[in-house]
Regions:
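NAD(P)H-binding glycine-rich loop region in Rossmannoid oxidoreductase-like domains
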Residues: 73-119
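Conserved Rossmann-fold NAD(P)-dependent oxidoreductase catalytic core, especially the SDR/UDP-sugar
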Residues: 96-98, 125-188
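Conserved small/polar residues in nucleotide/adenosyl-binding loops
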Residues: 197-204
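Active-site helix of classical SDR
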Residues: 191
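Conserved catalytic-core motifs of eukaryotic protein kinase domains, centered on the activation segment
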Residues: 39-40, 104-111, 151-155
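N-terminal Rossmann/SDR dinucleotide-binding element
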Residues: 1-89, 93
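Glycine/Thr-rich phosphate-binding loops of Rossmann-like dinucleotide-binding domains
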Residues: 13, 79, 104, 149-151
Length: 207
């Protein structure tokens, strides 16, 4: 099995890459190293040194005997390269972590808000369109966050999936199915509530 991990240099992506590689999957990490660039921008360093991708991949091959491939690509900017990569590398699955993932960073300034929205929404939209354009039958896993529901108690256990609700109308009550209402507390969490990742247009047809 072959898996492409978008955002595979991140704090969730790299452990996922190691886990799946250890289980025998062929792994391709796709990342533009934005987390490292943000650390440089903020002049911060991890308490645990984070090695370069080359060093990480070499160390993993030394201890496991397995290779992890790497491509430097910005998912939300380089659509044609992404389509070509999906066609050529032919993944069975794609795990999508390629998003700016810090709520405080997303609220730091107008520029940081713009970057978070541009990166997070375009990355997901490009990925969905690229999968359709590639014509491949690819399983997609996307990382969510409980923060889309806010940080105050809802007074109940938030249900999964759709809720059946009754709505009063001029013609009497009607039943509908809805998602539990989101209440994002940051620009980052707002991007996670956007439903671009639910499905491409039902009118899209693979060739």
């Amino acid at each position: 099995m072959r898996v492409m991990i978008l955002g595979g240099d991140g704090f969730c992506g790299w452990p996922t890459a190691l886990h799946l590689s250890a289980r025998g999957w062929d792994v391709l990490v796709v990342d533009n190293l934005s987390r490292r660039n943000i650390d440089n921008e903020l002049e911060i360093r991890s308490l645990t040194p984070i090695r370069t991708m080359g060093e990480r991949i070499a160390a993993w091959q030394e201890v496991s005997g397995r290779a992890i491939d790497f491509v430097n690509l910005t998912v939300g900017k380089e659509f044609d390269r992404l389509v070509a990569l999906i066609k050529d590398w032919a993944p069975d699955s794609v795990v999508h972590f390629a998003e700016q993932r810090a709520a405080p960073y997303s609220m730091k300034s107008a520029r940081h808000k713009l970057y978070t929205v541009d990166n997070n929404l375009n990355a997901t939209n490009h990925l969905l369109a690229a999968i359709v354009e590639s014509g491949r039958d690819v399983h997609l896993a996307h990382l969510g966050t409980m923060g889309v529901y806010g940080y105050t108690t809802a007074g109940l256990r938030i249900p999964e999936g759709y809720l059946k609700v009754t709505i009063d109308t001029d013609h009497g009550p009607t039943e509908q199915e809805i998602l539990f209402p989101p209440n994002p507390g940051s620009i980052y969490h707002m991007t996670k509530t956007c439903l671009l990742y639910t499905s491409p247009s039902p009118r899209d047809k693979r060739q």
